[in-house]
């Protein structure tokens, strides 16, 4: 499996660094005919009489009981649970030439109220508290019943990953912005690959084929309203939508859509948020595109909240894609350091606020021509990322996305930071650290934090990148996709993960993506397995 890990990482790396060429191709391509295309940003959903009903193919080339589209956290979780619920023949389709999607390059942090690391430290937490945090951060746009179902599934899902999949976590607990308490666990290698790798092995054990380079061209919904299968292209070569051999696959029970978001699709994301031009990089792998968002809408799936698109506030402009600098900016500087505007030498945001607040603050300063940096000293680094993600600092320094300075004066000179103002900012942090009181921006001092002042000093430049789509297909708490015209579940169609909306609202809290995908994938898989065969 070491060879598999290396090949997948090499594949993702090569895709990320050829992104400009790929996206130029995507920008020239028309995903669908003009009759099916969502023409403007105001068309968030199709109208009732626009929901397509498709003629059945003359013959089906093959059949399965359940077809799962997407091989990330959500898709593999859905497939496993469906198979274990005696669904019969379950298959997973992946359009790219390696499995995992964004899940492979995920940071491996998983929000779990009541996890063993919390219990060991005496941290009191509950599904209700996590739900409250999510609803507050999401500005009330999250659907309470969906959030409740997901948060109650958090600890059982964590235990499932450990006991059934064999996923390994370290013994640390972390806190992302917007969470009331530290509650996320870290995978042993600090990457979502630890989970995907174990999910793939589990799928193989269960006899679930994960078929690569299979592009879903059409979701086939019959005149009776039921989804009955897919038109696909086998042997697809990303991003050429006309490549591959057309085949029809019958889904006797259900199709489960786990195709993820569209962060890498500049044209489509600009329909929903015109500000997110190609000037914004994305943390997503290039396959995070819009074709199944468009297709699910075409057949009557209700798209909700698609204009809520999250930018990661902690990324660096000195590397492509997700990169590694964020683990310093968030893991060290946001928790036990400071973020400053280099033009003023002052903090400009609560470093533990939710991602939208922080990203908006960085972008506002960037638009003024100001550089913003995340800053921490040696003590902060030793207390945080050196423990939670061993060896990550070496990688960050090697890639020159985190920068090391012997003295604070050297750092200030490099970034033209007014030294007096910077020293005053650090003194203010140290005052609140000594008193144990929140600062003027509302940041609570992280438990165990020490005063800042022990060189050498480290920093990374901040530049938000498109990260996560909070909107998507409307589903109920069982994972059933809701029809735009009837407000009832579309028979035979389920969805989970980033392809769905109503879970996070306006803002997704960090570490809740893994929870969302795994928990809701499992829920959708179990429910889909209960469907009766239509033929």
Model-derived features: where do they sit?
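N-terminal Rossmann-like FAD-binding beta1-loop-alpha1 element of flavoenzymes
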Residues: 66-91
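An anion/pyrophosphate-binding glycine-rich loop and adjacent beta-alpha core
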Residues: 293-417
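Glycine-rich loop(s) and the adjacent beta-strand/alpha-helix scaffold that form part
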Residues: 237-244, 250-319, 514-523, 527
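Conserved beta-strand-loop-beta-strand element in the redox core of flavoprotein oxidoreductases
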Residues: 221-248
